[in-house]
Amino acid sequence: MRCDLHVHSVASGMCSTPGLNRICRESYNDAVEVYKRLRTLGMAIVTITDHDSIDAVEILRKYPDFFLSEEVTVRMPTGTEVHVGVYDIRERDHVEIQRRRNDFISLVMYLTERRLFFSVNHVFSSLTGHRDERDFDWFASYVPALEARNGQMCRKANADAANLAARFGKVAIAGSDSHAIAGVGLTHTEVPGARTVEEFFAGLVQGRGRIHGAHGGYAKLTADVFSIINSLLQEKPWTLAISPLALLVPFFTAGHWLNEIRFSRKWSAMLEDSEKRTQHLWDVAPHAHDLIPEHFSFGISLESSLGPSLGASA
């Protein structure tokens, strides 16, 4: 059973690029078109991971092989932000996840209590801003999975993410992270023998998952940006007046691509030079132990934290 675990649609909202965040969307992918393309490419189950949104569910809930997920912007105890994929949720989970997303500890407590599978995405990317070395301690202790292949990241960043997942003993997942329709489904996760969504995630936790598909590249990134610009021009014809600025796109994407490579090299080198640390929550934040109820136990092992039945109960 195959699934692209990182896909975007028009419901992902506006882009985060300064100057464009008022007029341009993160993605113009139509949810139904995404669904049909994924099925055509052999995905047995389908999800969409829009940024802090589950609006696509209204269109796709009629499909029995669709399950609800989202990509959550989460604030770490260090003040940095990361993108966390949360899978097979219910609509009520989305409300609580959004309420807690500015508090990593609170969010992890909820996800663990609800036995929801989650991952840190594009761990070696600068897309969410700067990173703190202590963030990796949190990942090592309280995140069950890392995105080890992202269809928009360079091969080196993906290799570093895969190595980190192996080093921390985490589940490795893959997804296209495609904001343009052309890349949807080209990177995916497979669990041989799985027949349902529940069996798929159980197989991941049991270590039977495999990652497949394309890495990112400068040409691919540039083509995706031009695709988004084309969709913007169709949605807002008045933007034709600023269309000559599109000539700058190859320079913009080159700068972004080089920065991503630099970011990945910097952090992979720092982690290689540091001693592997898997700390308890109160080792990272001494006063955090006081925040945890006596009856609550973090599941450090994947089996104990996520349990045998991974789907959220209705």
Give the role of each language-model region:
Residues 1-81, 182, 269-314:
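An N-terminally biased module of ancient metal coordination in phosphate/nucleic-acid-related enzymes
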Residues 3-22, 91-186, 190, 199, ...:
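Domain-core and long-helix interface of multi-subunit machines
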Residues 63-71, 143-144, 188-191:
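Active-site regions of enzymes building and remodeling cell-envelope glycoconjugates
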Residues 70-74, 83-88, 119-128:
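Conserved catalytic scaffold of divalent metal-dependent phosphoesterases
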Residues 197-252:
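A conserved mid-domain beta-alpha-beta active-site/ligand-binding segment of alpha/beta enzyme cores
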Residues 237-276, 304, 311-314:
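Extended, basic/helix-rich recognition subdomains
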